[in-house]
Amino acid sequence: TTKAEVVKHLEDCINNSGHDLVKDQREIWGYTNTTVNSNNSGYRYQYPIDHDLHWVGNSCVETVFANKHNLTSNWTYTWFSNTWSMFCSPSNDNRDIKQSYPFSFGWGAGPVSPKMVDEWKDWAARQSYTDGYTEDPRLTRSMRPYPAYDPNNKGNVLLDRKLDKGEPDYSVSYRYYEQTGYFQKKYINVGAWDDESNSFKNSWALVENPGVTAQTSAQLVQTTDLIHIRFADVLLMHSELTETADGINRVRERSHLAPVSYSLENLKNERRWELAFESVRWFDLLRWAGPSLESAGKILNDQTGFDLINEGIVTPMVRYDYAARLKQTQGYWPIPQDEIDIAGGTLEQNPGWDASAAFVDWNNFK
């Protein structure tokens, strides 16, 4: 496939597919569904109320390609539920439902680097805006900043990263690591209060669709799309390949950012902020870095050197040398050992993935 052919396909999608940008990017994500605030209990998520947000639903006009999910999962077939949001949601260890409403729980793998937040703020401060805006609204669209309450000393705040008054607080886990005061919230489990049962449900979908399933575990009832390609990504891909600013500025306009001319640096920034936490950043870094991978390694290493919370204690982050590790692996994943065994000696493991690379524990993380 040639570059010209790819551009032609992108232009066909832009002009003829019927896909488009939704009015407000926040309305793509499940946290803006109205079910969370449709109860008589007084439980409210203030952020979408303050910003007048209304979820556009799954399979929206901006979604080009996505995994679909539903309420038919059980403990034999778990994959009908959105497990990615389970991985990226806060721990349940010390969660207070009223304090953290409407967010449900997960396995705690969605913390955001404070260095990334600082870089985003710094970039946003140097932009020009329209419609009276003075900051990039995608920052609070994309993450849930919170005051981190101490699990061992009620009322004590360990770190306060709150950026929007409409976001709820959170009592951090007494045993989880790398809790930073920020969670991404594009893929986060969102629950809702159910008036009928007078209880909190681990997914808003259980309240909106009563009786569809008897399952109640957060692991089995997450129904939001896992989006792989959005129309915004298509516009940015087209800008990059044609070295034109039309796609960039169409994406920026939605977030009340003034137009810019095309440059690779402008393109890189738009992709970073518009598509934050959507699983495209890693491969963007690798392809822009080229064979040396030096720029990717530097960017990864820059995301260290801040305080975080491990086991309920504020501590400096381990300064792991991501650049050195990237150089060892060249960005490749390991070949599964089963496949190497089946191949009977015809396959060699990728560089950087021998036995010495195996993770031992956090205390021996170098």
Label the model's feature ranges:
Residues 1-170:
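An aromatic- and glycine-enriched ligand-binding surface/loop that stacks and positions planar moieties
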Residues 4, 8, 137, 246-249, ...:
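Generic alpha-helical secondary structure signal
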Residues 4, 8, 12-15, 118, ...:
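Polar/charged alpha-helical tracts
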Residues 126-253:
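C-terminal substrate/ligand-recognition segments
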Residues 2, 6-10, 239-246, 289:
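Generic hydrophobic/packing signal
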Residues 3-6, 58, 132, 225-227, ...:
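Active-site-proximal structural scaffolding
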Residues 30-99, 194, 201-228, 249-252, ...:
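Long, intrinsically disordered, low-complexity segments
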Residues 11-19, 237-244, 252-256, 269-273:
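Sec-exported extracytoplasmic/periplasmic mature domains
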